Amino acid sequence: MDSSNAIFKSFLGKAPEWYKICIIAFLVINPLIYFFISPFVAGWALVAEFIFTLSMALKCYPLQPGGLLAIEAVFIGMTSAHHVKEEIMANFEVILLLMFMVAGIYFMKQLLLYVFTKLLIVIHSKKILSLAFCLSATFLSAFLDALTVIAVIISVGTGFYGVYHKVASGNSFEDSTDISNDEKIITNKEILEQFRAFLRSLLMHAAVGSALGGVMTMVGEPQNLIIAGQAEWGFVEFLLRVLPVSLPVLICGVITCLLLEHFKIFGYGARLPRRVWGVLARYNLLKEQRMTQQDRVKMGIQALAGIWLVVGLALHLADVGIIGLTIIIICTAFCGITDEHAIGRSFQEPMPFTALIVVFFTVVAVIVDLKLFEPIISYVLSADPHSQLALFYVFNGLLSMISDNVFVGTVYINEAKTALESAIISREQFDLIAVAINTGTNLPSVATPNGQAAFLFLLTSPFAPLIRLSYGKMLYMALPYTIVLSIIGFLSLEFLLPPLTELMSNWGWIITR
């Protein structure tokens, strides 16, 4: 084997050859487009290529191919290293969240697995169980960040999967085995596939639930805080102003959840196999029998840490990541986890994704520097006031499907604020536009993992390949929710928001500044 073959073989490891060739082609083509055709076209090509690397997440983790494309983009001048740093610092809260909050949830896994195992064993109806997961995620994400909620659900799902996988592989609950290795599973393969389908559906219901809750409050999503800040709204006012859109969407989202389970379409409807239920019930019974006073105290500490988590985030007592760090300290200190290697394991899951997010911010910097969204923004602001709400919603939704909704929301609200300060739009129109931007970035963005950081985290988590949740599968399973949420959001924005906002203003519930 000559050196060139050796380099090609080691390049991107076990990724398919056609995929490696694609990435090399992108790296060759991008500078040519940038220098000889158009920087604008090159920018959109980079966005499309980055989306491609995300869609192939199960073939190769997107950090390496996406990172190479991002490095080249900076090198050829599509953006600067300084601007990348500015984007990272502007979104530093998200990085802290990924580093510390997800690791903090790791130390609450014992309590979460106990509670959700009870839920799984007690609730036999798949419809009710799906509804419970969806509404739990909705409620939690209204007060916590949606990414934190998904981290909780992933932690629980991994626990369930690990318990059954060990037994199906012929091991006991206590054995330490590789749950990604199916070689020892011979007779239980069909049951395992059904269990995977069951977990996929629960996870997607919860993921959409996190978006339903995230749109409702100013702490639900990072961009909500930015929008609330620009509009000068408090927690209650934000909730009331968005309610004419968020409430009908929530009701229709819940109905969609039940209908999908009833008709068993779009990958939903898989029931928990009876044998798996038996294993989980046996595991739960064994755990309860072996539970010592010390175990109960540990779960009590984790419960108190959970209460602090909800209160701290709901009242915004500190940045999300800082609260996550306090969770790590409290849980490890009072549960006796002082070994650095044991603590280090909690960071194994979030760190690759944190690195990927930084690469993503590089792409965002390219979008800003090359003004890729500027033609769309100019078109929307030049439209007549009656059409502006619909256009803001539609274009926010479309761009949020391919780009980060935090970025899209921030760009649009800043442009709307500039238009207000320039007297292009009235204050009343600005308030309505702010709601359109909030709902436009949060609702249609469930269509793809690109738009919501929580969805992207789920797709690139180690749990996704275990349950065979690919990019295409996520698109397919999110499709009915995307259609319902987007249409109901649009209709509510057009026909309910203006009259109900005026009504609440007349009642004195909200004020026009």
UniProtKB/Swiss-Prot annotation:
Pfam family, one: NhaB
GO-annotated molecular function: sodium:proton antiporter activity
Cysteines joined through disulfide linkages: none
Gene Ontology CC: plasma membrane
Keyword terms, alphabetized: Antiport, Cell inner membrane, Cell membrane, Ion transport, Membrane, Sodium, Sodium transport, Transmembrane, Transmembrane helix, Transport
Subcellular location: Cell inner membrane
Topology term for the membrane: Multi-pass membrane protein
Residue stretches spanning the membrane: 21-41, 64-84, 88-108, 119-139, 143-163, 202-222, 243-263, 299-318, 322-344, 350-370, 389-409, 477-497
Reaction(s) the record says it catalyses: 2 Na(+)(in) + 3 H(+)(out) = 2 Na(+)(out) + 3 H(+)(in)
Superkingdom of the organism of origin: Bacteria
Family, similarity comment: Belongs to the NhaB Na(+)/H(+) (TC 2.A.34) antiporter family.
Purpose: Na(+)/H(+) antiporter that extrudes sodium in exchange for external protons.
Protein name: Na(+)/H(+) antiporter NhaB
Organism: Actinobacillus pleuropneumoniae serotype 3 (strain JL03)
Gene coding for it: nhaB
